[in-house]
Amino acid sequence: MEKLSANKIRQLWIDFFREKNHFFIESKPLVPQNDDSLLWINSGVATLKDYFTGKKIPPSKRLVNSQKALRTNDIENVGLTSRHHTLFEMLGNFSIGDYFKTEAIDYAYEFLTKKLKLDPKNLFITYYDGDDITFEKWKSLGFSNEKLIKGSRKTNFWDLGQGPCGPCSEIYFDRGPKFDSRGSELIKNEIENDRFIEIWNIVFSEFNNDGQQNYTPLKSKNIDTGAGFERIVSILQDGPTNYDTDLFLPIIAEIEKSTVFQYKIENYFLKEPRQTQINKSFRIIADHIRAITLAINDGVQPSNLHRGYIIRRLIRRAYWNGKKLGISHPFLYKLVEIVGKTLDYRFDIQTISKIILNEEENFAKTLEIGYNLLESQLKINKNQIKPVTVFKLFETYGFPVELTKEILAEKNIDFDLSQLVEFQEKHSQISRAKKTTGMQKVINSLTQIKAKISDFIGYHTHHIETKISFLANKDEEVAETNGENLSYVIFEKTPFYATAGGQKHDQGWIIQNNSTIEILDVFKDKFLNNIHVFKGKIVKNQPVFLKLDTKNRLNLERNHSGTHLLFASLRQEFGSEIKQLGSDNNENRLTFDFPLNRKPSDQEIKSVENRINSYINQKIKRKYLVTNLEEAQKLNAIMTLEESEYMDPNSLRLVIFDKITTDLCGGTHIENTELLEKFTILSCQSKGSGIYRIRAVTSWNKYFEFLKGKIQEILSKISALKNKIKKIEPNFGLNLPNLVDLEQQFDYLKKIEDDLKIYYKKLLKSQLRIVKSELDANKIIEIGKFSFYLDFNLPLHNLKQIAATWREQNPRISFILGANLVNNEFLIIVSSAILASNQILEKILEIFTGSGGGNYKIAQGKIQKKPEKEVFIKLLWENITEF
C-alpha cells in the first residue's frame, strides 16, 4: 500500500473512470440548484437526480464525480468519533442504463487493488442474501466465503419505499487487531468500530417498488456508487482517524498557532482523558471551518434562518471550542486560506474571512456575558435550567440552542425541551435530510414512456392541431383525465418549449371540446419528449388545438437573447476567462452569474450595459446553424454543460449574432437585436465570495417600470431625509418640480437625494460636535462590575445619535439617556456595547409602563413621565443579572 496525498487519490479516481469512458462531472455547489427537497447537497448522487429520474439527458451513460456534500443531522458526533463530518467528499461512479453488476464490481476491485494497491487480504465484502450474481462475481475474484458476508434486507437492500430500488454490496477495509481485537462479527452484527471501515457501497438499482411492496424488474438498470473520500485517505495515510490526514492536519497546525495546547495523534491509542477533550476541540474546529468556508463560498450568509442559521451555528460552535482551547480572540477567519489549500479549491479568501471575522466579533461580544448568565442560573437553581433561560441565551446572546445543550451535557445536566419546540421550529430550520439518492420523486406513470414520441415545432410554429401520444396522472396512463389533479400529456407535435438551458417553459393553452386549459409546466423526459403539466379534463383519442402565448414567448426570447449578449459584453469587459456559472430567464427578467476576483465597478457595469444597447442599435440578425461538435469548436462556439446535456454531439444547434457571439443553445431567440428595444441592468450583487449576479430587464416597457419603481423609492428616501433635517432645522423646506419625462425626473431626484444626504451629514456633524466632550463623571454609576451613565436632561434632537456616539467612544459604559416629549411623555434610549440594550429597555417599560423596542446595541421607547433617578438605580441593582 502506497502512501498518497488526498489530491493524488482524488485525481487517480477521476482518471481511472475516465479511462473507462466515464464523463467527469465537476463538484457542484453545496446549495442545491432548482431542488427544494434538499437543504444541502448531502450525497454524491444528489446533483445527478434529474439524470436518474429521466428529467434531464446525461452527457454520457457513464458518469464519475467527486462531490462535496454537507450534513448536520448528527453534528454532536463530529469531533467525538473518528469519521463523522459536516463537510465530506463522495467519490462516485454511475451507470445509467449501461453496465451493471459484473463491470461495477470489476471496476471497484481494480481501482482498490491496482491503483491504490490495497491488499485484497484486507478487504471484506457484504452482499444481499439471494443476490447470487454478486456473490459469485466476488468469489471469482478470489474472495473466500469467510470474506463474503451475507446481508439482510435491512443492511443490503436500498429501498426508499417507492420507485427504483435494489440490493447493494459494501466493501470494508480491515485495519487490523490494534484497532479492535474482535473479528468480522463486527460487520455481521453491525457493531460500530474503528477496525473494519466501510469505504465503498455499490447500489444495484434493478427493481421498481410500486409503493405497495410489489417489485418488478426495471428495463433500464442503473449503478449508483459511493466511496468515502476521507476514509480512503485515512487508510492510505495510515491515520488512526480521518482527522489524522493531510485534509485536516494542516488546519489543525494552523489552529495550534493560536493556543498553548497541541493536538496529539498518538492519544487515539493512549486515551488520556484531558488530551481526548483537547483533540475533540481541535477536530470540531477543523471540521467546521471546512463546511463554513465552502458554504459561504457557495453563497450562504450566516443568519438566523434556514441554511444561514446552520452556518452561524457551526461558526459559534467552532468559536466556543476555540474558547475551550484558551483562544480568547477571533481566529477562525485566519483558517480560510489553509482550507483552500487542503481542498485544492480557489476561494475569495478576503471576502470569506471578512464574513467569518464579523460573525466571530459579534459572538465574542456576547459569549462571556451569556456564559456568565448560564453559570449564575445554574447556581441559583441548583444545576437546573429553565427553558426561558435557554431561549434568552439564543435570543439575546446568540447561543444556538444546540450549543447550550452541549455545554449542559458536558456538565451532566439535562433540560426540558418541550417548551422550546415552537421556538426551534421558528428559529432552527435545521436539515433533517435523510441519506437519499437521486432516485426519489419519480412520477411513476412517466416510466411507461419507452421512446421519443413527440416533436418540438415551436421555433417557427405557434399554434397547431395535433394528437395526444401519451396521457397520464401521477401513477398510471389514462384514457381521460378527471380535472381534479395534476396530469401529464405528450403531444405528437408541440409548440411549447420545455424548461431547459436556463430558459423557462412556454405558456399557453390546450383547447378541446370548447374547453380551454392552461399549461402549467413543460419539462423534458430522458427521450427528449416535452411533458406538459396541466389540470383539467381532456380525452386521449380526440384531437386537440394548442395555442402558444406569443406575448409571453416574445418576452422569454428577449431575455434569453439578452443573456447571450450580456455574456458576450462581460467577456469584452473583463476578458475571455469570464464563465457562465448560471442563468435564469423568465418572461419578466433575466439573471446571470459569473466569477470575478473583485467587485465590478459601477462604471464597468454601465459599460457592459452600454455595449449591449449598441448591439441593439446595430440591428443584428440572429442566425441558427445545426452542426457537429468538431465544426462548432472551429467556430469557437461558447458551450456550457447545461446546454450540452440536451443535445446530440452530432446535431448541435448554434445561435449566432454576427461579430458578437456564437453559442450552443437549444432555446428560443428574437430574430433581430432591435427587438430587445432596451437592455437595463437592475443590479450587480455578490452571490457569494467571488461570484456575482447581474439582474436585468429588456424592452422599453420593463425599463419604464423599473424607472417608476426607482422614482418612488427615491421620493420615499427624500421624504425621510427631509423629515430628519426638519428635526434639526424646523424651518427647512423643499419644493420638487413636476417633470413629465421619466428619465429627467429620475436624474433630477437622484441628485436631490445625494445633495440632501450630504447636507444632513453636515448637520449631524455639527450636532455631534456638541456631545463629543468628556462625560460628566457625576452621572456614572457603578453597579457590580458594570458602569452605567444616566442623563435624563438631554435635547430631544439626535438623542439616538448621541447615544450611539457615546457608546462607540466608551464601550465599557452602558448609557441610559432621556428627553421630554409632548404631553408629558418621556423618551428613553438605552445604548450598550456589553449588555443587551433591548433587555434593559424591556424591564424599564415593564416597570414604568411604556412601549418600544430595539436590538442588542441600542433600543428606544417612551414612558408616561420622567422617572426619578433613584428609582432607576434601584431597578438596575435588582435586575443586573438578567441583562
From Swiss-Prot:
Q: Which UniProt keywords apply?
A: Aminoacyl-tRNA synthetase, ATP-binding, Cytoplasm, Ligase, Metal-binding, Nucleotide-binding, Protein biosynthesis, RNA-binding, tRNA-binding, Zinc
Q: Which Pfam families match?
A: tRNA-synt_2c, tRNA_SAD
Q: Does the keyword Nucleotide-binding apply?
A: yes
The record's remark on the cofactor is: Binds 1 zinc ion per subunit.
Looking at its record, which EC class is this enzyme? Answer: ligase
Q: Where does Zn(2+) bind?
A: H560, H564, C665, H669
Which InterPro entries does the record associate with it? aa-tRNA-synth_II/BPL/LPL (IPR045864), Ala-tRNA-lgiase_IIc (IPR002318), Ala-tRNA-ligase_IIc_anticod-bd (IPR018162), Ala-tRNA-synth_IIc_core (IPR018165), Ala-tRNA-synth_IIc_N (IPR018164), Ala-tRNA_ligase (IPR050058), Ala_tRNA_ligase_euk/bac (IPR023033), Thr/Ala-tRNA-synth_IIc_edit (IPR018163)
What is the E.C. number?
Answer: 6.1.1.7
GO biological process terms held by the UniProt record: alanyl-tRNA aminoacylation
Keyword set includes Ligase: yes
List the GO terms this entry assigns under cellular component, sorted alphabetically. Answer: cytosol
SMART domains referenced in this protein's UniProt entry, alphabetically: tRNA_SAD
A molecular function GO annotation: aminoacyl-tRNA deacylase activity
Cofactor(s) the protein requires to work: Zn(2+)
Reactions catalysed:
tRNA(Ala) + L-alanine + ATP = L-alanyl-tRNA(Ala) + AMP + diphosphate
List the subcellular locations. Answer: Cytoplasm
| Record function comment | Catalyzes the attachment of alanine to tRNA(Ala) in a two-step reaction: alanine is first activated by ATP to form Ala-AMP and then transferred to the acceptor end of tRNA(Ala). Also edits incorrectly charged Ser-tRNA(Ala) and Gly-tRNA(Ala) via its editing domain.
Q: Which HAMAP family match?
A: Ala_tRNA_synth_B
Say which family it is in. Belongs to the class-II aminoacyl-tRNA synthetase family.
Q: Show the domain comment.
A: Consists of three domains; the N-terminal catalytic domain, the editing domain and the C-terminal C-Ala domain. The editing domain removes incorrectly charged amino acids, while the C-Ala domain, along with tRNA(Ala), serves as a bridge to cooperatively bring together the editing and aminoacylation centers thus stimulating deacylation of misacylated tRNAs.
Identification of the protein by name: Alanine--tRNA ligase
**Natural source organism:** Mesomycoplasma hyopneumoniae (strain 7448)
Q: Which gene encodes it?
A: alaS
